[in-house]
Curated annotation (Swiss-Prot):
Component of the distal appendage region of the centriole involved in the initiation of primary cilium assembly. May collaborate with IFT20 in the trafficking of ciliary membrane proteins from the Golgi complex to the cilium during the initiation of primary cilium assembly. It comes from Mus musculus. It is found in: Cytoplasm, Cytoskeleton, Microtubule organizing center, Centrosome, Centriole. Its main location: cytoplasm. This is Centrosomal protein of 83 kDa. It comes from the Eukaryota. InterPro entries: Centro_Cilium_Assembly. One of its GO terms (biological process) is cilium assembly. Belongs to the CEP83 family. One of its GO terms (cellular component) is centriole. The modification Phosphoserine is found at S689. Keywords: Cilium biogenesis/degradation, Coiled coil, Cytoplasm, Cytoskeleton, Phosphoprotein. Residues 32-625, 656-689 form a coiled coil.
Amino acid sequence: MDTFPSLFPPGGDSRLNPEPEFQNMLIDERVRCEHHKHNYQALKIEHKRLQEEYVKSQNELKRVLIEKQASQEKFQLLLEDLRGELVEKARDIEKMKLQVLTPQKLELVKAQLQQELEAPMRERFRTLDEEVERYRAEYNKLRYEYTFLKSEFEHQKEEFTRVSEEEKMKYKSEVARLEKDKEELHNQLLSVDPTRDSKRMEQLVREKTHLLQKLKSLEAEVAELRAEKENSGAQVENVQRIQVRQLAEMQATLRSLEAEKQSAKLQAERLEKELQSSNEQNTCLISKLHRADREISTLASEVKELKHANKLEITDIKLEAARAKSELERERNKIQSELDGLQSDNEILKSTVEHHKALLVEKDRELIRKVQAAKEEGYQKLMVLQDEKLELENRLSDLEKMKVERDVWRQSEKEQCEEKLRASQMAEEAARRELQSTRLKLQQQIVNTEKAEKEKLENSELKQQISHLQIQVTSLTQSENDLLNSNHMLKDMVERLKQECRNLRSQAEKAQLDVEKTLEEKQIQWLEEKHKLHERITDREEKYNQAKEKLQRAATAQKKRKSLHENKLKRLQEKVEVLEAKKEELETENQVLNRQNVPFEEYTRLQKRLKDIQRRHNEFRSLILVPNMPPTASISPANFQSAVTVPGAELSFPPHLQEEQHQRELSLLRKRLEELETTQRKQLEELGSPGE
């Protein structure tokens, strides 16, 4: 509004100004407006270009941040790999330390070797002692059984002799008594009435039936005796089997003892091999110790080289950091001087520059404080830049509004607007240049700050690595000293172990010699015992063979006797049958004679026949009663002739004499049966004693 008086003359009369001048002024004003429009369009295009450049710069910032993150991740991976390698090396060192033999481990190895060497030998000696005690117990048991059986045999022998003598005395007394009875019977028969012969015949028939029953009972007893004989043979076979089994067991024990001797020899050889293997293991451990010493020396040289390289890298990094700091300070001073020299009209650009400075200061502080919060700050910067972009767009819209208002005002203030527009154009061009320069400087500052941050991080990481390496170097030096000390100790222990191994070898050789001596002594004892056992076995076999021969002889004799007895029994049965038939004929003849008168010739013939029958009957009785004695006729033909007075009269004995004779015969048969039983028992006892 203040510029209007300068446009019009002071007189104030519009009539004085002609119309063509006014039209010219309007034309000029229109030209200026068009020129302003063209400028506005150019500014708009420039604004779009600046926005695109801003977007590009943001994209570049993102890319740079991504590259920074990738580089950080790579460095972290490298650090982790290096740490893993250090951990593995530390583990290897610990393993080597564990593999190194300490005096305690050597003592444990010694104890284990002693246990492994002594335990099987102790067990072997213990088993041998147990077997020796077991064999002694068995030998004592067999000796006790032998003495017991011997005493029983002697006792049975004495009893047998006593019983045999008693039975001999009995038999002698009975024979004497029987002879007396025989004489008495002979006298009685001479004094007996011949009329009682018929009763005597009946009594003889009864006796015959009784004798047949006795024969049957005797046959049953003979069958029982056969069964007993078979049982005795089975017992003898069982005894023989038991002896064979005992022989096999003794042979098996001898074989087992020989096998144990061989196993003891093999065990001694195995112990020698184990000693050789232990010596080889000691040599291997010594070689491993030398290798460990070499590796430790190589590791120490590598550690020294790493120390030197780290020192050089640290010095290089320090120099580069000092150069970067000086360059950054110079650039900051330049930027501050350039920012101070900017015009006061462009307040928007100043506010953005101040805001960027504040952001840079905050970014520097936050990077110094927190290295790990770089990502968050980058995102915050992006948000701040987006906010700034919005603010710039709002300000540009405000500027456009102001331009519209100014266009309205410029219609009245043409000259002032032209001057201001020119000044603003110049200022805008200068501002654009300054903005471009500031943007380039900001980008350089951002890159420099990122480089500085990277360098700081690398410096911190390198410092940490250096500290870790120093710790490792100290630990390695300590481990080297420990290993050297342990090597000296190990050498001493190896020498001691060698001496102990020599002592152990000498002790083992002595023990082996002692064991061999004991084994030889035991072998000699076992051979003596074996020889004794063989002698005992041969004696037993001889006794057994003798007993077997005796049994066979007795069996053959028994068979012969049995066959003889059977033949005699058959003959006697035939004779008895013949006598029965003759007796029946005589009875019929007697009946006929009793019914009719018999002539003298027939009577004499019948009398002779009766005498013959009586003689045969007496022979049969004598054979039954005393089979070994020759048959004797107790009644002579003269006695019979004198005894016979009446023809047709029956021959008979008194009843009390018949009963006594029958009882005597029964007693004789019982005695004979008892004698057979005693003889068979004696034979069985004789067979049983050598079998046992």
